[in-house]
From Swiss-Prot:
FMN binds at G59, Q102, R220, K299, T321, R322. Disruption phenotype: Loss of growth on stachydrine and its degradation product N-methylproline; still grows on proline. Proline uptake is reduced by 41%. Stachydrine (an osmoprotectant) no longer protects cells against growth inhibition by 500 mM NaCl. Stachydrine uptake is normal, but its metabolism to ethanol-insoluble compounds after 18 hours is seriously impaired. Colonizes Moapa 69 M.sativa plants as well as wild-type but is slightly impaired in competition with wild-type bacteria. Its EC number is 1.3.1.-. Gene3D superfamilies: Aldolase class I, FAD/NAD(P)-binding domain, NAD(P)-binding Rossmann-like Domain. Binds 1 [4Fe-4S] cluster per monomer via a modified motif. InterPro entries: Aldolase_TIM (IPR013785), FAD/NAD-bd_sf (IPR036188), FAD/NAD-binding_dom (IPR023753), NADH:flavin_oxidoreductase (IPR051793), OxRdtase_FMN_N (IPR001155). Its cofactor is FMN; FAD; [4Fe-4S] cluster. In the N-terminal section; belongs to the NADH:flavin oxidoreductase/NADH oxidase family. This is Probable N-methylproline demethylase. It comes from Rhizobium meliloti (strain 1021) (Ensifer meliloti). The gene is stcD. The keyword Protein transport does not apply. GO terms for biological process: fatty acid beta-oxidation, unsaturated, even number, reductase/isomerase pathway; L-proline betaine catabolic process. GO terms for molecular function: 2,4-dienoyl-CoA reductase (NADPH) activity; FMN binding. Keywords: FAD, Flavoprotein, FMN, Iron, Iron-sulfur, Metal-binding, NAD, Oxidoreductase, Plasmid.
């Protein structure tokens, strides 16, 4: 048996799990027509191939038609899901992993205007703030129907080859019954804890009657809502004991907190700048009190924390879910004693925030995740060695250098600054975003292992690039802040970058005009307000900081509201002029009919970046493709074959913000899909 606690097998009823690491249930929003088709299967199988003991799919699969798929959920109520499930389970089993699926009825945690436009049901009329739907108070015939739906869905999953099912209780219908905050029913399903737990046990009994004993059944539930009047720790312990004593389930999966609001969700699933494993000790208390198999996941991003979770006996199986979105091969690298090669999860939460905004989940710095059908997690060697010159060491340039190095090419990188990182190094200046620098550090480490040559403090000139006789040139020079957005007074403003970097001294009465909606404006506001300034953030948008997204916004708002920062939406800064020692801001609105003046001593503009593209255009006439990228080939993940200049000596590509202001993920994706076939 291995000495590493993480690599020790675990016996869960009739199943032997090959190690202690699991990918807990989550919904990456990859279903097509409610089915786990090729894309979803490829994503799931990659984690099994990487060595996890168990992967749980769906977060969660809907059991009823009145549980609309607001997260693009799998539709477990449809019979046609069975063959798709069978293809997935067979493929996962071939890789040696166990696979389960999570089932749910969302209750009020959805919307009536999704799916079949059926009323949302819950044990009270109280809406969930996050999804805003006012529910119908559930009736007796609804309860009977939904219990049967759970059993039918579990039977389908067993027919599809699943090793078990997990009930998603927390925040969903089962926990809405269990919590005194959300259950206002009379009769057998409301009031006392016995009655509030009745729905959960009726569902479990119905499922167990259908699937038999040789099938794993677990519950992921809230053992402490951390809300006045809600399920508290004492009641959570009692619920845990009752679940064990029922004899109906095989493990507990512990959650602490509530997810009905963005702040609540962010405390349950912490992001960067928040503490690692904040609920691990609590899960350990549940395990100690019940002496029953216990699973847990909540910001356990690294092997050391996971190892502690198992070695200390706090849990039996440790979930590293977001970590496996970043690197699906964590277990393989542990076994091969290559922990330093594990791509680190930086807690940026790009994955979850995209889901909650209605998109598919992507990792901020692994562009292959969710694109396994076209993008590789392991880079294959090229058939012939080429010389690749990269200009810039932001995320795009470093990813290009890393991938080219993995291909076996000679790689030379030029960087004008003394340190790598570009905008990522800048954003990591803020304590809450310090983890972002790992995006850069990991790539630098990988590049050094691959023999990439770096020239820092070197301004790359076109002649110097051509003197290298490259086969491929990658321009990843990024951009500079775009502040030329006013009708007059552009010379009087500073950029958000100036504030974050410390290049501009903070004012005392500051307007931040945020026309980009990304992190920079909020970071600048936090820096200024912490320094004692009175700060107002103004945006012409009707919503605030849309590019930051919901969960990432929470820590900012908690800080900025306490510092009395003012937030103004739907107003546009049009011009700035100097008046003595003050600045007069001329403010209008896209909605028209507004013109007013405000006085500040500093104005900050956040309006994205302008590409640093002079070098690209200097080199373009000498390239074989004249800088052109074949979009169809790029989208399909195929090699670039454009030749527009037969006399050209090299292929030329520009990527990241050297093309246009986008984000870190887009920059890394540019690099991966262009360089993987070079």
């Amino acid at each position: 048996m291995p000495n590493d606690p993480l690599l020790q097998p675990y016996q869960l009823k009739h199943l032997t799990l090959r190690n202690r690491i699991i990918v807990t249930a989550h919904e990456p929003a990859y279903p097509e027509d409610g089915m786990p088709k090729e894309r979803y299967r490829a994503y799931t199988v990659e984690r099994a191939r990487g060595g996890v003991a168990m992967t749980m799919t769906a977060g969660s699969a809907a059991v009823s038609k009145d549980s609309p798929p607001v997260f693009n959920n799998l539709l477990a109520y449809r019979d046609e899901i069975v063959p798709w499930i069978r293809e997935m389970t067979d493929a996962v089993h071939e890789e040696g992993a166990v696979i389960m699926i999570q089932l749910t009825h969302l209750g009020r945690r959805t919307r009536w205007d999704k799916g079949d436009w059926l009323p949302v049901v819950a044990p009270s009329h109280h809406r969930e703030a996050a999804h805003r739907a006012f529910p119908k108070k559930i009736e007796d015939w609804d309860i009977d129907r939904i219990i049967k739906d759970f059993a039918d869905a579990a039977e389908r999953m067993k027919a599809g080859g699943m090793d078990g099912v997990e009930l998603e209780a927390y925040g969903h219908l089962i926990d809405q019954f269990a919590s005194p905050l959300t259950n206002e029913l009379d009769g057998p399903y409301g009031g006392s804890l016995d009655n509030r737990m009745r729905f959960c046990f009726d569902v479990l009994k119905a499922i167990r009657a259908r699937v038999g004993d040789e099938f794993i059944l677990g519950v992921r539930y809230t053992a402490d809502e951390c809300l006045p009047g809600g399920t508290d720790k004492a009641e959570g312990l009692e619920i845990s004991k009752r679940l064990k004593e029922s004899g109906l389930i095989d493990y507990l999966n512990i959650i602490r907190g509530h997810i009905d609001t963005d702040p609540g969700l962010t405390d349950v699933i912490p992001i960067q700048g928040m503490a690692n494993s904040p609920h691990l000790d609590f899960a350990g208390e549940i395990r100690a009190a019940t002496n029953f198999p216990t699973f847990h996941a909540a910001k356990i991003p690294d092997v050391a924390t996971a190892r502690h979770a198992i070695a200390s006996g706090k849990v039996d199986m440790v979930g590293m879910t977001r970590a496996h979105m970043t690197d699906p091969h964590i277990v393989r690298k542990i076994i091969e004693k290559r922990e330093e090669d594990i791509r680190p999860c930086v807690g940026a939460n790009y994955c979850l925030d995209r889901i909650y905004q209605g998109g598919a989940a992507y990792c901020i710095h692994n562009a292959a995740t969710g694109r396994e059908l076209t993008m590789p997690h392991s880079i294959a060697k090229a058939h012939c060695r080429r010389k690749v010159v990269v200009v810039g060491t932001g995320p795009a340039g470093l990813e290009a250098a890393r991938v080219a190095g993995e291909r076996g090419h000679e790689v030379i990188v030029f960087e004008a600054a003394s340190d790598p990182g570009g905008q990522v190094r800048l954003t990591a200046q803020s304590p809450r975003r310090r983890e972002m620098i790992s995006i850069i550090d990991w790539r630098m480490s990988q590049c050094e292992k691959l023999g990439v040559t770096f020239h820092f403090n070197t301004w790359a000139e076109a002649e110097a690039i051509q003197a290298e006789s490259p086969d491929v040139v990658i321009i990843a020079t990024g951009g500079l802040p775009h502040t030329e957005v006013l009708s007059r007074g552009n010379e009087l403003v500073v950029s958000a970058w100036d504030i974050i970097s410390g290049d501009a001294k903070p004012g005392t009465n500051v307007l931040i005009f945020d026309d980009a909606g990304d992190h920079a404006a909020l970071q600048a506001a936090e820096f200024l307000a912490t320094a004692g300034a009175r700060v107002e953030i103004m945006t012409p948008d009707r919503s605030f900081a849309p590019e930051v997204m919901a969960m990432n916004l929470v820590p900012y708002m908690r800080c900025l509201q306490k510092l009395d920062v003012t937030f103004t939406v739907t107003y546009r800064l049009e011009a700035v002029e100097k008046s003595g020692n003050e600045l007069v801001a001329h403010v209008g609105s896209d909605y028209g009919g507004i013109s007013k003046q405000r006085t500040f001593d500093q104005v900050v503009v956040n309006h994205g970046t302008i590409p640093l593209d002079e070098l690209y255009f200097e080199l373009k006439p000498f390239s074989s493709n004249l800088g052109e990228i074949a979009h169809d080939q790029m989208i399909a993940g195929e090699p670039q074959s454009v030749v527009r200049n037969a006399e050209g000596k090299f292929q030329l590509f520009r990527i990241g913000d050297a093309v246009a202001a986008r984000n870190t993920h887009a920059a890394i994706y540019d690099a991966l899909r262009l360089l993987k076939d070079i």
